[in-house]
Amino acid sequence: PSVQDAAAQLTADVKKDLRDSWKVLGSDKKGDGMALMTTLFNDHQETIAYFKRMGDVSQGMANSKLRGHSITLMYALQNFIDQLDSTDDLICVVEKFAVNHITRKISGAEFGKINGPMKKVLASKNFGDKYANAWAKLVGVVQAAL
């Protein structure tokens, strides 16, 4: 789908679920960002190859480059949440975010591997499938930009 078509999937209910779950996820950006990244690496070990510049990602919090990426990821998500009321602005920030992934040759399919870890992190915060599905729709907007 086009980025516009993917963004059109973000209904009022989906946006509410994103915002409600972000209130919890966004309250510990470093911890939850690290949880997302380490779960991604554990569940999809092949993705570690995209992060070679970070060195040994198995060091977790002790790896400052991984910590930095995790925090940056969470602020990107914050930016997406902040733009939910303006599809045009959301698409602008998503396309800017996508550039960083395109230069690293990360496809939409590869990027979509974050959905499983996101579902697990959400579940650890007592957010069920409805919320994971909302995040998958937002990830779908990024995938469409890749």
UniProtKB/Swiss-Prot annotation:
Pfam families: Globin
Subunit text: Homodimer.
Name of this protein: Globin-2B
InterPro entries from the UniProt entry: Globin, Globin-like_OT, Globin-like_sf, Globin/Proto, Mb-like_M
This protein's UniProt keywords: Heme, Iron, Metal-binding, Oxygen transport, Transport
Domain Globin residues, every copy: 9-146
Organism: Anadara trapezia
Keyword Metal-binding: yes
Record-listed heme b binding positions: 101
Family, per entry: Belongs to the globin family.
Molecular function via GO: heme binding; metal ion binding; oxygen binding; oxygen carrier activity
Record bears the keyword Disulfide bond: no
Superkingdom to which the source organism belongs: Eukaryota
